[in-house]
């Protein structure tokens, strides 16, 4: 099993991009391994497929950005089905759980993610970031 010291969780949003850059700078400084994760959640197969396609685009861009910075970024794309419309906060918890599961699986030292996601309208810490910070067993760096 491959081990990554850094796991950067991104959705391609402004804050996600800040997290990507921060994670790559740390990776380059310490010459360590990094993986980028995108969690595609959908209640219908077509919706999930759309989000998986977006995730592939986002992760390909992250790999290109990493290459331009001299960092090799590995991609993790996770597709999750939700059978019905989730209640408030359920989607954030599902995304956070997928990030945390990947962190455990790959024995990650530090998770890096944006303070708000693409769907966040609250100026406070984003719901996914908050869930990850609360439940992570490893260090979490939140980019703002």
Regions found by a protein language model. Name each.
Residues 30, 102, 106-107:
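Active-site charged/polar residues at nucleotide-handling catalytic sites that mediate phosphoryl
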Residues 52-54, 58, 93-97, 125-129:
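Charged helix-capping and loop-helix junction motifs
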Residues 110-131:
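Glycine-rich, Arg-bearing micro-motifs that act as flexible, cationic patches
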Residues 1-53, 67-71, 75-76:
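Small/aliphatic-rich secondary-structure junction motif
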């Amino acid at each position: 099993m491959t081990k990554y010291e850094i796991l950067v969780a991104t959705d391609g949003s402004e804050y996600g991009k800040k997290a990507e850059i921060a994670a790559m700078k740390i990776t380059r400084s310490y010459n360590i391994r990094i993986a980028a994760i995108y969690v595609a959640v959908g209640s219908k197969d077509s919706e999930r497929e759309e989000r998986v396609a977006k995730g592939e685009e986002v992760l390909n861009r992250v790999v290109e950005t990493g290459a331009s910075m001299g960092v090799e970024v590995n991609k993790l794309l996770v597709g999750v089905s939700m059978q019905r419309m989730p209640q408030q906060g359920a989607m954030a918890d599902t995304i956070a759980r997928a990030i945390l599961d990947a962190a455990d699986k790959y024995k990650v030292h530090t998770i890096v993610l944006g303070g708000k996601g693409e769907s966040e309208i609250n100026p406070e810490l984003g719901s996914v970031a908050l869930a990850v910070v609360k439940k992570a067993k490893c260090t979490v760096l939140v980019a703002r």
